[in-house]
């Protein structure tokens, strides 16, 4: 009987090992959060206007974010197309963008390596996504573009010590994907087509940032949407907190975080990834462009709400350069937010 049992066990192990695509390594999940979570430990960055930044300029920027406790930089996209921009920010042979800024990503990664900043690299984004969110043919074409960009990035930067993850820059939300079938189409024809290929290229985690609008979606709808979205081959699911875009008021924010948490970890019992907060540090009178840095009082409430959610393991901001950096185009308001934030974390660290 023991020999028979051993035979069964070995047979099952052999079957499971064969059932996995041998070219697909296990995705490398981020390490568990430290016992004491910091506040903002990462930020997004957009490469507009940074095409010709030198490594010294990247050093200055990354030193600044590191000085406020950040260790992660998410490049929102490395290729972008809209009526005003048609560009790739590395040495790419692709034919779906017109302009190539050949050295931008290389310089960023070189600086990040020196500064011990972990970089998650975003792929290609065509701004007509907002008109084609459930258009399968369009999604398949754009998935191919993202894969092409990823293959080139892997060939050029795959072994770089600062390169720690991938980011899919297409932001899904429950109002557009308002049925299980629509989420399935997005998952199977877009997210998984990309992420499955990424996991063949390397074992780095793949992330996405979902959002919602409280005037269009209830907490219950967000919960179910997050449960369905997290059936995708994703290791990091971020939730934009929506405060800067005026998608939610501060007094309702916790209820949506809690709903997202339930969707990821209770309704979907199979999600093995992590839950990050994407905290909006910008503001505007109507939640639309042009934006400017928010007040610290508002950001503090957003931070404390995110930190109250047990499964939120990391909080990243959108985004430090515009809203908090010394080089912000909104210098006075950015300086005020940054200095108030630095005083806040200094006090927190002293406790």
Language-model segments: which ranges?
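An active-site-proximal structural segment forming one wall of the substrate-binding cleft
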Residues: 99-115, 135-165, 190, 197, ...
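Aromatic-lined substrate-binding rim segments of carbohydrate-active enzymes
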Residues: 57-67, 71-128, 182-208, 252-259
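Substrate-binding cleft of secreted/luminal carbohydrate-active enzymes
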Residues: 164, 238-250, 263-351
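Bacterial Sec-dependent N-terminal signal peptides
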Residues: 15-37
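Active-site groove signature of glycoside hydrolases
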Residues: 124-128, 149-181, 316
